A protein has these predicted regions:
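Disulfide-bonded cysteines in secreted/extracellular proteins and peptides
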Residues: 7-10, 34
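Extreme N-terminal regulatory/targeting segments of RNA polymerase sigma factors
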Residues: 2-5, 42
Length: 157
């Protein structure tokens, strides 16, 4: 007898007698591949969250994440669809690369929505340059030498 079920991740219908599956919860099934992809995505997201929290603790000089910062992070994740790694990179961009001070932060990370797009463009341009120069050998690169001659000024007598 066929047991048709729907994968909760990819939403495709499959027969659980013919394909390997994982029972995610009672009466909820998923392909084995879909479940493993989702599990690895969740592990990566958790690692990104831990890295963000450690960076914020170091940045603001606190011993823990304050409720204000936690609420800001949750707002950015839910309303703006930012990622944990994106928020961390935006903070790194604003405070370390741009060299801004944390004194005006007032114990929060409210600057993130204002610098997120700039940080994204900055890191995207770095990624693009790495992709473009991936197959180039830096040792063989010889810069072109340009000789500029400047005539000495003439004295007016």
């Amino acid at each position: 007898m066929a047991h048709k079920v729907k994968c909760i991740y990819c939403h495709q219908t499959f027969d659980r007698d013919k394909y390997s599956f994982v029972q995610v919860s009672p009466r909820r099934y998923a392909h084995t591949e879909c479940a493993s992809k989702e599990q690895s995505r969740l592990k990566q997201e958790e690692a990104d969250k831990i890295a963000l929290e450690e960076y914020i603790i170091k940045l603001l000089g606190d011993d823990f994440i304050t409720p204000r910062v936690r609420k800001q992070i949750n707002t950015y994740i839910e309303q703006y669809q930012y990622t944990y790694s994106g928020i961390r990179k935006a903070l790194v961009y604003f405070y370390e690369i741009k060299g801004n001070s944390t004194e005006k932060a007032n114990g929060g990370i409210g600057i993130v929505p204002y610098v997120y797009k700039d940080a994204f463009n900055y890191y995207y341009s770095i990624w693009e340059a790495n992709q473009k120069n991936q197959n180039k050998d830096v040792q063989k690169f010889v810069s072109k030498e340009k000789v500029i001659k400047i005539e000495p000024p003439k004295r007016n007598l």
